[in-house]
C-alpha cells in the first residue's frame, strides 16, 4: 500500500512540474548494513516483489513518466533483463562512483558492450543515451 501511495504522489507531482526524467526503483540491499548486523532485518524482498514494483511503476506512471529505469547493479544482470521485459525502459548503473551496492559487496562494473549484449539478448535494440534520454549511439 505504501508503494502505491508513493507512486500516486510521484505521478501527481510529475503532472504539476514535469520535473522527473525517470524513476529508478531501488532494491534495498541488506548486506553490511546495521539492520543486518543488529538482526532487525534478516532478508531482502524477493525478486518477484522487485519485478512487481517495476511493473506497477510502469502501469501507474503511464502517460506521465515514460522512463522506468532498471538499476542492474542492484538487480544483477539476469534479473535486470527480466525487469526490462516487465516494465523497465532502460538500464542504468554505469556510474563510476557507485558506493551503495559496492559497500554491500555487490558487483558494480560492466562495460557498455556487455550492457548492450544484455539488451540484445532480450530482443531489444540497445542505445547509449544522455541524462535527458537523447540517443548518443545505437549498437
Q: What is the meaning of each model-derived region?
A:
Residues 11-139:
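Auxiliary Fe-S-binding modules of radical SAM enzymes
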Residues 1-15:
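Helix-rich catalytic cores of soluble enzyme domains
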Amino acid at each position: 500500500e505504501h508503494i502505491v501511495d508513493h507512486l500516486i504522489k510521484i505521478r501527481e507531482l510529475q503532472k504539476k512540474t514535469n520535473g522527473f526524467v525517470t524513476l529508478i526503483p531501488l532494491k534495498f540491499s541488506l548486506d553490511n548494513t546495521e539492520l543486518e548486523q543488529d538482526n532487525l532485518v534478516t532478508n531482502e524482498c524477493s525478486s518477484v516483489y522487485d519485478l512487481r514494483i517495476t511493473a506497477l511503476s510502469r502501469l501507474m506512471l503511464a502517460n506521465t513518466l515514460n522512463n522506468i529505469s532498471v538499476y542492474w547493479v542492484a538487480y544483477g544482470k539476469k534479473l535486470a533483463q527480466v525487469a526490462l521485459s516487465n516494465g523497465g525502459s532502460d538500464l542504468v548503473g554505469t556510474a563510476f562512483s557507485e558506493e551503495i551496492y559496492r559497500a554491500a559487496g555487490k558487483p558494480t562494473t560492466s562495460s557498455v558492450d556487455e550492457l548492450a549484449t544484455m539488451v540484445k539478448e532480450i530482443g531489444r535494440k540497445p542505445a547509449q543515451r544522455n541524462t535527458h534520454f537523447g540517443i548518443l549511439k545505437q549498437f
